[in-house]
Amino acid sequence: MNADVFEAVCAMGDAARTAQSQLAQANTEAKNQLLNAIADALDQHADDIAAANTLDMNKAETDGMDAGKLDRLKFDQQRITAAAQGVRHVASLPDPIGEIVRGYHLENGLRLQQVRVPIGVLGMIYEARPNVTVDVASLCIKSGNAVLLRGGHAAEHTNAATLAVIADVLTKHGYDHNMIATVDQYGRDGATAMMEARGHIDVLIPRGGAGLIQAVVRNSKVPVIETGAGNVHIYVDRTGNPDKAIPILINAKTQRVGVCNATEKLLVHKDIAESFLPKAAAALAAAGVEMHADERAYGIIEHAGIANAQLVHATDEDWDTEYLALKIGIKVVDSLDEAIAHINRHSTGHTESIIAEDYSAIEEFTARIDSAVVMVNASTRFTDGGVFGFGAELGISTQKMHARGPMGLHEMTTTKWIGYGTGQVRE
């Protein structure tokens, strides 16, 4: 790692902390005014941001970026407008800062309160996701945090244009623009420096593919909140309703293939496989999905006359693969127990869904599946901070400490204890 870059990034972290102390003093009304001003500015400068995104998109296409990543990189007028609306929604949400989590009196009269406070300085390392720049900025402002961003070279023009708009609004409203800053100018050395900057950055959040996330988890000296890759499953129980299951499956697999809440695996109970799989396979084939089927599923689908280039034999590697493409693994299971065991063995702990009408099966599945989100008779695509009503999200945490699932305002806070006394001393 370049020593000069490390020193510069540490200095940026310190400047962000100074800026954060100013933001922490702002009341809810002031933060909301700032957020609404940023939303308005994003709308006003949407043409400039979209033009910058076109530069990034053209280069990515020339470089051969795959369709899933290109979709995430896209930040056109429609998505900029949606991002601005997300900022306004964050402004409308209750302020978590100062919220009393719990409180009580000790026998000696000392009154204790646990209250929510900002974490401090966050670091965000992500790739080809320009919407994240807006989401993180809005959530940090509302929760009183500063942030250093490493948005990756693929979105460098888009992120630069977006951050210029945000910095201008911060300055015009009397805030230190260092509270939201980027290290993109330092390339990969900037990301490495962020991982080393313990004491200058309080927590690091990676968001991207499995390779990026694991590189940060393994190498960071700064505490990490791990956002997960999405090896996401749908299990169709023997009591599952095909009229529900097939639309859910097609939505979950094909609506946006390059996102972490897209379904990658389909498990089907043996009692319904013969009747369900031909219909499901026909729908998947019509949507252009390549099916990687185990032996039993392959036989059923082939017998139904859907054997073509879109049907291949699954390998052991398939069960652990997040495709982020028009591909899906299909397996027939003998029981609910087998489905749960398979999912808990191969899932990344993101989102799983059960399609069933039997309440006992639903209860068992939701209780035993060890993932951040479990859906019942619904698409896995709903696992999203915006859909959950958070306005925006930092990512979807698949770890169990501090945060799990979509991370919104509350997940960007920590707590401290305040003791109110009248002269008490400990005996």
Swiss-Prot record:
InterPro entries, per database record: Ald_DH/histidinol_DH, Ald_DH_C, Ald_DH_N, Aldehyde_DH_dom, G-glutamylP_reductase_CS, Glu-5-SA_DH, GPR_dom
Catalyses which reaction(s): L-glutamate 5-semialdehyde + phosphate + NADP(+) = L-glutamyl 5-phosphate + NADPH + H(+)
Listed GO CC annotations: cytoplasm
Cell compartment(s), UniProt: Cytoplasm
Domain of life: Bacteria
GO biological process, one term: L-proline biosynthetic process
Keywords assigned by UniProt, alphabetized: Amino-acid biosynthesis, Cytoplasm, NADP, Oxidoreductase, Proline biosynthesis
GO MF annotation terms: glutamate-5-semialdehyde dehydrogenase activity; NADP binding
EC code: 1.2.1.41
Recorded family membership: Belongs to the gamma-glutamyl phosphate reductase family.
Function recorded in the entry: Catalyzes the NADPH-dependent reduction of L-glutamate 5-phosphate into L-glutamate 5-semialdehyde and phosphate. The product spontaneously undergoes cyclization to form 1-pyrroline-5-carboxylate.
HAMAP family registered for this protein in UniProt: ProA
Protein name: Gamma-glutamyl phosphate reductase
Lineage start: Bacteria, Bacillati, Actinomycetota, Actinomycetes, Bifidobacteriales
